[in-house]
Structure formats: C-alpha cells, structure tokens
Amino acid sequence: NDNDMSIAENHGGMYRNLKLLRDTEGKAECNLFKAMGLDYVFVKDGNDIPSLIEAFEGVKDSKKPVVVHIVTQKGKGYAPAEKDKETWHWHMPFDPETGKSLYNPEGEDYGTVTCNYLLEKMQADKSVCAITSATPTVFGFTPDVRKKAGKQFMDVGIAEEHAMALASGIAKNGGKPFYGVYSSFIQRAYDQLSQDVCINKSPVTIAVFAASVYGMSDVTHLGIYDIPMISNIPELVYLAPVTKEEYLAMLDWSLEQNEHPVAIRVPASLVSDGKP
C-alpha cells in the first residue's frame, strides 16, 4: 500500500525508488523488488476495488513470492483526511460532518511540554537531538516545529530498531539523543535497546509515551507491557514521573549525565502538579 506517506512524511532512500515506480507506472528499470528476485505487479489506482480484484485474481495462484505495488490516496473519500493526512492517520471520535473532535481535553499535555523543553535545549546546546520513528507529534513536533529543529531532528520512518541503534551511536560520540516512542512500539526495538544501548551503557534518553490503558484503546496498541519488558534490562534506569516538575527534572538529569541509558515513562494524562 503506497500512499506516499509514512505516518508523517517519508524519509529514506527506499522511497525514491517507490516514487520512480509510481511515476513510471511500475515500468522503471530500477525496481527494488525485482532486484530481490520477486515478481512484481503494479496497481495504478488502489482505491478502485475492481482494479484490486483484478490484480489479486492474477497473482493468487502464483507459485512464487509476488509484490503487488498498490498506489492509494491516504484519507481517500473524506475531505479533512485528504487535506491533512498526518493528523488524520488516526483520530479520536469526531463529528463526520465537521471533522471536529468530540473530545477536547482542556489543559497542557505532555507532548507540548516535551516539545517546548526540547526546542529550548536544542537552541542552547547543539549536541541535543530528537529522534522519532515516524511519530513526531507524540512529543509535539508538528511540521512547523520540525522545521525549527532542523538537523537536530531525525525521523527514521517506521523503524524503531534503527532509531534505537542510531541514538546509541550518537550518544557514544558525545551527542545527547532523545528518542520519543509509543509504549506499544518499543517492543520492536528490544534487541537494539538491550544490546546496542544498554550493553554499551550509551547515555540515551528514551521517552515512553502512552504507557497506560488510556493511551491507546485497541488490542494491538495497549501501552501496558513496557515495565515488565524493559525495566529488568541491566544498565537501564527506568523512571516514572507523576508531575510536570518531576518529568522536566528527569529529562534534565538524563540528558546531562553520561553513565546510563535512561527511559522515562511519560504520564498518559494531562499535566498535573500533583496537588489534590
């Protein structure tokens, strides 16, 4: 399913070949999939059901692995989603007539807190950088913020393993990497966290977001397994703040120390000062 998007915009060399294949309707001589020995079928309009049926009928009895390259439009059929593809990758319950959310929490959230903190740190210290694996808005990095951060922001695409290993390398070379990731997705990078980061004692700061039954609401994305999964890895310090003040203090300490990898379990609620 090639809609020319990751969750945010695409990054990486592979996408240049996908664009070439789209532009040539699959006829380009340079074809990543054929180079790997795979059969290849191009579908120009993947939002057209008859075209999909025809393509699948043509390959269902194949005795070889086949890549069906389906070009689609993200958000097809719903104007707000077509206009703002990144925001509408997922959405809280909304009014289909207006596109407005039915749930509008009031107050400061930890994504905004993290964003403001990182921008200030980046301006004061060029060794600070922020890494995401295709979910930059989880820590408040909207397109405008990403432009402000410039080269101090890196989106590796949906590749949590690479994000973790990249952060380790930056830290070992004197940088101060911050990696923001959903709790549900950190499982994808377990090997890199254990071997690349923790065995090497790389002082990486990892912010674990949506670590709660309230963070994500579907079976595949529940953020409830991060504590048993990563808290027992040797050399990793796992912290769980309950207030904004604690969270910011932990970020400060983690980014400035160079002895341990540190993960911070970001509260899934709105910002609290801890008072009743």
Which residue ranges define each predicted feature?
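A glycine- and small/hydrophobic-rich beta-loop-beta segment
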Residues: P276
